[in-house]
């Protein structure tokens, strides 16, 4: 069945490419490589020790319909080092893109590339293994900043299937040296046969106000503070008083000079109730300090190393991350 499905997808893709070729301006292509090394030395109840080590390769080909519009198809594959070869299934990519100076809109199954939400709402481990959004995303850019609107489907919607999706908004607005960041996230999870449906909803939202110093000895220096509110409700689980709610202060600090940076957050209050958020925030008293070495930063290749210290409810843990990201793209004229 799987073989037949892939054959059907391949045949349909070839047909679409052939038809689009007659009406498009250029054949466009994209290629990428990601290397991930994430070693976590966690000792508390909220996190467990693990090492994630893998490489993902991706390729896309499509057609530039006009100056603003394009359709692309392709896929990516993750090799998790230490696992058996071909332990993971390929991830297909098929999407429409509209892009101008004010809007970048994508619909279909498209690479995440840049996280929409911070780790408190959406842990980075998800992006390692689920590199695509499936739905639609619009990034609006304006003179004062940008706003992102996301709708991400996770499963089919019919009787007998789980129904899961994420919807949210995030962005930043600048006022000279001041800025405001906003985030809203809603995750819906329903499952069961018709008439016997259980629903588990969760989400969060937050606002931060910050100040960024410019024209100083540092290349970048910013600080912000605000709050994060989360909730979790389950219509079937009678062991909890639903909905669960949390409210906590959330502060950030970032400083960079050339290839050296320091990135820090402090979350204190009630623990989060987000199954897809970073579990360390569930302790309610969490700080993270990342020392960063930006080893390479060119238009096509980025490489960085992070040594991360985690303060989890009175206990200090650490982790290390190495990340290499390469992106290439071009056109093949007709």
Residue map of PLM features:
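Beta-barrel outer-membrane channel/assembly domains of diderm bacteria
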Residues: 22-88, 93-99, 319-333
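Hydrophobic h-region of N-terminal signal peptides that target proteins for export
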Residues: 14-23
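Surface-exposed coil loops of outer-membrane beta-barrel proteins
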Residues: 41, 104-172, 186
């Amino acid at each position: 069945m799987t073989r037949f499905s892939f054959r059907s997808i391949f045949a349909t893709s070839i047909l679409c490419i052939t038809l689009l070729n007659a009406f498009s301006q250029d054949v466009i292509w994209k290629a990428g490589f990601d290397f991930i090394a994430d070693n976590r030395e966690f000792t508390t109840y909220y996190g467990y020790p693990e090492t994630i080590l893998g490489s993902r390769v991706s390729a896309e080909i499509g057609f530039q319909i006009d100056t603003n519009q394009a359709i692309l198809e392709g896929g990516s594959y993750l090799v998790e080092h230490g696992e058996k070869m071909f332990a993971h299934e390929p991830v297909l990519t098929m999407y429409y893109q509209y892009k101008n100076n004010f809007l970048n809109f994508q619909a279909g199954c498209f690479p995440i590339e840049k996280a929409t939400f911070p780790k408190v709402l959406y842990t980075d481990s998800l992006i390692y293994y689920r590199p695509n959004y499936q739905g639609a995303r619009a990034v609006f850019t304006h003179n004062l900043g940008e706003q992102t609107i996301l709708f991400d489907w996770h499963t089919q919607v019919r009787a007998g299937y789980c129904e899961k999706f994420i919807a949210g908004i995030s962005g930043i607005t600048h006022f000279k040296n001041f800025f405001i960041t906003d985030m809203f996230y809603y995750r819906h999870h329903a499952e069961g046969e018709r008439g016997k449906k259980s629903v588990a909803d969760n989400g969060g939202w937050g606002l931060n106000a910050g100040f960024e110093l410019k024209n100083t000895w540092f290349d970048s220096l910013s600080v912000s503070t605000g709050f994060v509110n989360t909730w979790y409700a389950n219509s079937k689980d009678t062991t909890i008083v639903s909905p669960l709610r949390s409210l906590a202060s959330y502060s950030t600090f970032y400083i960079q000079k050339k290839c050296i940076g320091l990135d820090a957050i402090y979350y204190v209050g009630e623990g989060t109730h987000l199954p897809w958020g970073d579990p360390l925030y569930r302790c309610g008293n969490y700080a993270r300090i990342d020392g960063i070495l930006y080893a390479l930063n060119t238009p096509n290749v980025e490489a960085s190393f992070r040594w991360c210290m985690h303060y989890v409810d009175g206990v200090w843990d650490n982790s290390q991350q190495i990340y290499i990201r390469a992106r290439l793209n071009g056109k093949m004229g007709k």
